[in-house]
Swiss-Prot record:
<dbReference type="GO" id="GO:0009432">
    <property type="term" value="P:SOS response"/>
</dbReference>
<dbReference type="Pfam" id="PF02151">
    <property type="entry name" value="UVR"/>
</dbReference>
<dbReference type="InterPro" id="IPR010994">
    <property type="entry name" value="RuvA_2-like"/>
</dbReference>
<dbReference type="InterPro" id="IPR001943">
    <property type="entry name" value="UVR_dom"/>
</dbReference>
<keyword id="KW-0267">Excision nuclease</keyword>
<dbReference type="Pfam" id="PF12826">
    <property type="entry name" value="HHH_2"/>
</dbReference>
<dbReference type="GO" id="GO:0009380">
    <property type="term" value="C:excinuclease repair complex"/>
</dbReference>
<dbReference type="InterPro" id="IPR038476">
    <property type="entry name" value="UvrC_RNase_H_dom_sf"/>
</dbReference>
<feature type="domain" description="UVR">
    <location>
        <begin position="204"/>
        <end position="239"/>
    </location>
</feature>
<dbReference type="Pfam" id="PF08459">
    <property type="entry name" value="UvrC_RNaseH_dom"/>
</dbReference>
<dbReference type="InterPro" id="IPR000305">
    <property type="entry name" value="GIY-YIG_endonuc"/>
</dbReference>
<comment type="similarity">
    <text>Belongs to the UvrC family.</text>
</comment>
<dbReference type="InterPro" id="IPR035901">
    <property type="entry name" value="GIY-YIG_endonuc_sf"/>
</dbReference>
<dbReference type="GO" id="GO:0003677">
    <property type="term" value="F:DNA binding"/>
</dbReference>
<dbReference type="InterPro" id="IPR036876">
    <property type="entry name" value="UVR_dom_sf"/>
</dbReference>
<dbReference type="GO" id="GO:0009381">
    <property type="term" value="F:excinuclease ABC activity"/>
</dbReference>
<dbReference type="GO" id="GO:0006289">
    <property type="term" value="P:nucleotide-excision repair"/>
</dbReference>
Length: 618
């Protein structure tokens, strides 16, 4: 049993990281402290003016643990790593923890390539980015390939290597074939230098050079060459237009600001590379009404740069907490100097004001869309309540489905909709353990039993410990259950609920002969819902989502065994013959279509095994 009083008394006066846990042992908050003793005790002192969010967290703390570090910077590094690992409920978490794409020029190679990557390493390459839009990176690389004859293959080509036959790209003029030694390293590097100039925003020099060559070609009556150069000039100018110069310097900088409306906050980030905006991104954090902006920005930086592949030389913010400590952490991550600056006036300040305006517009648009959707979903839930004659609107809806292919790897899925919106954080997957073969009814009974058994256990644990109601994995029960099937599936669900003495309405979602949502079955009666357009769309969405989620899980489980359910069940087909069949025919469909003679052409196949394959797929 965790003795809170004893643990608080014995906290060390050293720097470190603390982890708050709920009654289920889940880590709900990770924080760092210069002095653990002082920081952790503050949470449990009634005299402290805690925010509503902190008060809610403290009510759910069942125990805590801590890790001592040698310094505050070590504590910060560990805190960021643990937040990334555990994704605690009460930490500020960015929903889009993504690595942005970069354009990479592989300068460490004798004959460099231009490729897309999401990982920045010190490998001698030159990186351009980040770009928020992955398709933009792809477009730029494709345009570069059309303009500059550089290689796209992954071969390890060195200048002194033995020449090999060039590929089709050489024949159509897209590559100078360094693999065949048709171009020297120094000449190839001149082309790469032009690519780097273009990506660095110095495209006007390249355009001028191309124009001179175009004019010479026209004077010499080489009109085809002149037209080709004209097209390349257009492509280069198109790439240049993709990035807008807003500063006269050519530093790599990020500008971060925020806008709060009293309840929620929108963070906006502008990425400037070589004086150009190469992208921007926003993040909306809910329920920040009682947190000051400097704390919000400090927490945002830890989360954002803890997951990004690139840290710029300078980061501009309107204000910040722990500035020196965060600078030290960023510099360690970057392995070169990174500075946080708060501009007071001038063009840097003007850009930050622009970033804040964008954050304000983004949050307002988000709220407007949210209100519009809320009104729509409110009407859907009201209509659903009336159609089914329920006592209350079904605020939380859970839908269940079973997926299997050829009777193997049966899996179950549960998707959740709250207030009309999908809630992926509450989705659950079940691998069927007790049922062999394709038996959807028994499989459904298993997953429903497990779902509500876990839920009741969690509720009992919460009540026994006299804690505030905690959102465990299964402890929140639905107001309505939707089954992807008819009366048989409904009866299974009701049987499970009755066994646990739980009273929840159960509905079946039925489809027509074209596999489109047709209506609902409730209390033994089929209800046609096509006259309720918004309800029809909502039920179709739920049905599609639960099916998609089940199928995606099934595919992930099959993995390398995706052919197991068929080939392994054919008599006289062992591991060797299975591999040979797949190697030669490439797919199950091709094996199904194979003739007797084609099967016998495989060295490991004999007459009997070929006949077995034909008989199996007959």
């Amino acid at each position: 049993m965790f003795d809170l009083e004893y643990q608080l008394k014995n906290l060390p006066d050293k720097p470190g990281v603390y982890l708050m846990k709920n009654n289920l042992g889940e880590i709900i908050y990770v924080g760092k402290a210069k002095i653990l003793k002082n920081r952790v005790r503050q949470y449990f002192q009634k005299s402290q003016k805690h925010s509503e969010k902190v008060k809610a967290m403290v009510k759910n703390i069942e125990e805590f643990e801590y890790i001592i570090t040698d310094s505050e910077i070590e504590a910060l590094i560990l805190e960021c790593n643990l937040i990334k690992k555990y994704r605690p409920k009460y930490n500020i978490l960015l929903k889009d923890d993504k690595h942005y794409p970069f354009i990479k020029v592989t300068l460490a190679e004798d004959f460099p390539r231009v490729i897309s990557t999401r990982k920045v390493t010190k490998d001698g390459s030159k990186y351009f980015g980040p770009y928020v839009d992955g398709s933009s990176v792809k477009d730029i690389i494709e345009l570069i390939k059309k303009t500059f004859p550089i290689r796209t293959c992954k071969k390890n080509i060195v200048e002194e290597a033995k020449a090999i036959r060039p590929c089709l790209n050489y024949q159509i003029g897209l590559c100078k074939a360094p693999c065949a030694q048709y171009i020297k390293k120094s000449e190839y590097r001149e082309t790469i230098d032009d690519v780097i100039k273009l990506l660095s925003g110095k495209h006007l020099d390249i355009v001028e050079n191309f124009k001179l060559n175009m004019e010479k070609a026209a004077e010499n009556l080489e009109f085809e060459k002149a037209a080709m150069l004209r097209d390349k000039i257009n492509i280069i100018e198109k790439i240049g237009e993709k990035q807008k110069i807003i500063l006269n310097n050519f530093d790599n900088e990020d500008y971060i600001s925020l806008y709060s409306d009293g309840k929620d906050t929108c963070f906006q980030v502008f990425f400037l590379r070589n004086g150009k905006i190469v992208g921007r991104e926003h993040f909306i954090i809910e329920d920040t009404f009682d947190t000051n902006s400097s704390t919000l920005i400090s927490n945002f930086l830890k989360e954002f740069y803890g997951g990004t592949a690139y840290i710029p030389k300078t980061i501009y913010v309107p204000n910040i907490e722990d500035e020196a400590l965060l600078e030290q952490w960023l510099t360690l991550k970057k392995e070169s100097k990174s500075t946080i600056k708060i501009p007071i006036k001038g063009e840097k300040k003007n850009i930050l004001v622009l970033v804040e305006k964008n954050a304000k517009t983004t949050l307002e648009n988000f709220k407007l869309k949210y209100l519009q959707e809320k009104a729509l979903y409110d009407n859907v839930l009201k209509d659903l309540k009336n159609i089914l004659r329920l006592q209350e609107e079904p605020i939380r809806i859970e839908a269940f489905d079973i997926s299997n292919i050829q009777g193997f790897d049966s899996v179950g899925s549960m998707v959740v909709f709250e207030k009309g919106r999908a809630k992926p954080s509450d989705y659950r997957r079940f691998k069927i353990n007790t049922v062999k073969g394709a038996d959807d009814y028994k499989s459904m009974k298993e997953i429903l039993t497990r779902r509500f058994q876990h839920g009741l256990s969690e509720i009992k644990s919460i009540q026994d410990r006299k804690l505030e109601f905690s959102s465990g994995k299964f402890s929140v029960f639905p107001d309505l259950i939707l089954m992807d099937g008819g009366k048989g599936q409904i009866n299974i669900a009701l049987e499970v609920l009755n066994a646990f003495n739980i009273d929840i309405p159960v509905c079946g979602m039925v489809k027509d002969n074209k596999h489109r949502t047709r209506g609902l079955i409730y209390n033994g009666e089929e209800i046609i819902i096509n006259k309720y357009g918004s309800v029809m769309k909502f039920i179709t969405r739920v049905q599609d989502e639960v099916h998609r989620f089940a199928i995606s899980y099934h595919r992930s489980l099959r993995g390398k065994n995706s052919f197991h359910s068929l080939l392994d069940d054919i008599p006289n087909i062992g591991e060797k013959r299975k591999k040979d069949l797949l190697f030669n025919f490439k797919s199950i469909d091709n094996i199904k279509k194979a003739t007797y003679e084609e099967l016998l052409s495989i060295p490991s196949m004999d007459k009997k095994s070929a006949e077995c394959v034909l008989e199996f797929f007959k």
